[in-house]
């Protein structure tokens, strides 16, 4: 079995596939076989008895890449990938939240808003965000899509509403120290507006028991940070964590 799993791999790829313990970073360009190495490694770990299927976590960024990884492992592993955790970061976060929903303050069947649904949700609460610049009278919904995208990016970067507000306040203080800098003053006003809207958006989602795409990642991080026993449970479960395109 090992010979088949290592077939067609170069020396460096074989070393990566058969690496037994400790962290390992692979730096390689597109199309160089990184996903192949990860899928072969999953199969090799199982064939060597170094891990059970539910002790391996493989993460990637896109649904397409996750499905591709699942298909390849399904071919390599006789009994399939059923119990192997192969998913995107957001899908992994979603699974953590559902498995620990009550602790996270969520209904286990919570709804995940799509981007269009998040925009509709924002529009329904438009006058609760205290917007001025980002709610122009001529076109009140003009910036909704941009704000939703910004909030999502902030959560993907693990920036909390509190941290964003701190940044906006620092910018405001700097602008007050440079009263002649009108562009800085305008930016500070805008960022303060965004910061308050971001915090309000998160509060409204929580109040209605909803989760958006960014919250799948962000809230799962919060869950692990705030609940050491839950973190420990997953640390003990996963003997090997493989990340595609970290």
PLM region descriptions:
Residues 7-18, 22-26, 37, 57-58, ...:
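Conserved helicase NTPase motor core
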Residues 20, 73, 99-100, 125-129, ...:
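Alpha-helix boundary/capping residues
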Residues 116-210, 228:
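Basic/charged alpha-beta structural segments of nucleotide/phosphate-handling enzymes
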Residues 53-54, 134, 213:
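A local structural micro-motif
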Residues 1-108, 112-113, 119, 232:
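P-loop NTPase Walker
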Residues 24, 46, 77, 104, ...:
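Short amphipathic alpha-helical interaction patches enriched in hydrophobic/aromatic residues
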């Amino acid at each position: 079995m090992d010979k088949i799993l290592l077939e067609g791999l170069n020396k460096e790829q074989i070393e990566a596939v058969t690496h037994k313990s400790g962290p390992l970073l692979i730096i390689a360009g597109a199309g160089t076989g990184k996903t192949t190495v990860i899928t072969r490694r999953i199969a090799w770990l199982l064939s060597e008895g170094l891990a059970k299927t539910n002790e391996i976590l493989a993460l990637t960024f896109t649904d397409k890449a996750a499905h591709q990884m699942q298909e390849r492992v399904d071919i390599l592993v006789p009994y399939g990938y059923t119990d192997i955790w192969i998913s995107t970061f957001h899908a992994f976060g979603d699974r953590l939240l559902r498995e620990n929903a009550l602790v996270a303050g969520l209904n286990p069947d919570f709804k995940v808003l799509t981007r269009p649904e998040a925009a509709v949700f924002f529009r329904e609460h438009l006058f609760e965000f205290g917007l001025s610049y980002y709610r122009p009278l001529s076109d009140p919904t003009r910036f909704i899509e941009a704000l939703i995208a910004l909030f999502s990016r902030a959560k993907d970067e693990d920036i909390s509403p509190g941290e964003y507000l701190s940044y906006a306040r620092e910018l405001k203080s700097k602008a007050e120290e440079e009263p002649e800098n009108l562009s800085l003053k305008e930016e500070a006003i805008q960022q303060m507006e965004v910061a308050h809207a971001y915090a309000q958006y998160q509060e409204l989602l929580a109040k209605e028991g909803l989760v958006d795409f960014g919250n799948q990642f962000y809230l799962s991080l919060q869950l692990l940070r705030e609940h050491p026993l839950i973190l420990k449970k997953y640390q003990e479960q996963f003997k090997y964590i493989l990340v595609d395109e970290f």
